[in-house]
Amino acid sequence: MSRPEYPKIASREQWLLARKGLLAKEKALTQQRDALNAERRQLPMVKVEADYRFQGPEGELNLADLFAGRSQLIIYHFMYHMDRGEGCDGCSCVVDNIGHQAHLHARDTTLVLVSRAPLADLQAFQRRMGWSLPWYSSLGSAFNYDYHATTDEQVAPVEYNYRDKAELERLGLNYHVQGEQPGVSVFLRDGAQVYHCYSSYGRGLEMLMSSFHYLDLTPFGRGEGWDGMPDLDGKGMHWTRLHDEYQQPAAVHDCCASTKP
C-alpha cells in the first residue's frame, strides 16, 4: 500500500485561522443536529397492535417485557447469519461500540439486540464476542418482517430504508431485497401498551458507531477511499471485521461488511 497523502504543513497562526473557520461550521452543524433531534422527538407514534413473541434466557417474552420495566426501548436489529453460524461483521462492530448500560438506564431507557435466529446460536456467538447486552430471538415471529429487518417477498412486501423493491433494484441495492438487514427501532411504553416511535437504517446507523466518530477526527478519517479519504487497505467501506479476526487473512462475502477469513 502506498503512503497516504498527508495534510499540508502550515504555521501555528495559519493552522489557528483554519481551525477557527472550521469551528464555526462545527457549531452550526451542532445547532442543526439539535434542531433535528428535537424534530425526531416530536414525531408521532404508532400503537403496536401485534402480539410479538421473543425468546430470551428467561423464556418467552412479549415486546413490553423487553423494556425491563423502563419506559423507553431501543432495539438494534442485529443481522445474524444462520448459514455461517455467526453475526454480521458490521453489526458486530456496532455492538462493540456500545458502552455501559447504566447511563441509558439512568434515562429510563433499555437497549437490546433482536435477531431472527435460534436463541442458542445467538448466545454462543455472544459468549465468543464477550458481550453482555440483552439479546433476544424473534425467530418464528413477524417482528423482523414488520420492521423491515428481514426482507423476503414470499412473506411480506419488500421495503428497506423506506424504499420498496423496485426502487432498491433501480438504485442497485439488491442486497437489501432478500435476507437479514441492519436497523434500529425505538419504542415507548405506557403501562402494557407499546408504541413505535422511530426506525432508522443504512447510514442512519452511523450515529451508533463511536469508533467512526473518533476516526472522523483524524487526517485519514475512516480510511475508506471516498470523500477525499485514503483507502487504507483497499477494501473501501468494507473493512470492519469481527474483533477476533483482524489478524486473519480476509476474503469477500456478501454481508454489509464484506471481508471474511
Feature names for model-found ranges:
Residues 115, 137-139:
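Residues at the C-termini of beta-strands that transition into short coil/loop
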